[in-house]
Amino acid sequence: MPPIFTNVILAFATAFLGTLIFRSHLMSSLLCLEGMMLSLFILSTLIILNMHLTVSFMMPILLLVFAACEAAIGLALLVMVSNTYGLDHIKNLNLLQC
């Protein structure tokens, strides 16, 4: 396995570990999710370019579209929670309340 694949997989694992460690803050979770999506984008692009798969050139672009949608929804949720409660702690929120 080339070293760049190892670096990308290590970046994904680090972002996933960050999601597990910093799951009490919404902003930290969103940043770690963005890191995971970026490493998945780089990994899928490298695999497609190394395998010369001309059929699936659209897959990394589709992944970026979903990452942008996830970021927009996450930031909207962060703004809503910050305006409503004044903090971004996930453990203090109860989404079952009206």
UniProtKB/Swiss-Prot annotation:
Organism's domain of life? Answer: Eukaryota
Transmembrane segments annotated in the record for this chain: 2-22, 29-49, 61-81
Membrane topology (UniProt): Multi-pass membrane protein
Which terms in the Gene Ontology molecular function aspect does this entry carry?
A: NADH dehydrogenase (ubiquinone) activity
InterPro entries, A to Z: NADH_UbQ_OxRdtase_chain4L/K, NUOK/Mnh_C1-like
- List cellular component terms (GO): mitochondrial inner membrane; respiratory chain complex I
Pfam families from the entry? Oxidored_q2 (PF00420)
Catalytic reaction(s) noted:
a ubiquinone + NADH + 5 H(+)(in) = a ubiquinol + NAD(+) + 4 H(+)(out)
UniProt keyword annotations, A-Z:
Electron transport, Membrane, Mitochondrion, Mitochondrion inner membrane, NAD, Respiratory chain, Translocase, Transmembrane, Transmembrane helix, Transport, Ubiquinone
- Localization annotation: Mitochondrion inner membrane
The record's subunit annotation is: Core subunit of respiratory chain NADH dehydrogenase (Complex I) which is composed of 45 different subunits.
For this chain, the family text in UniProt reads: Belongs to the complex I subunit 4L family.
**Protein name, as recorded:** NADH-ubiquinone oxidoreductase chain 4L
The species this protein belongs to is Avahi occidentalis (Western woolly lemur)
Highest lineage ranks of the organism? Eukaryota, Metazoa, Chordata, Craniata, Vertebrata
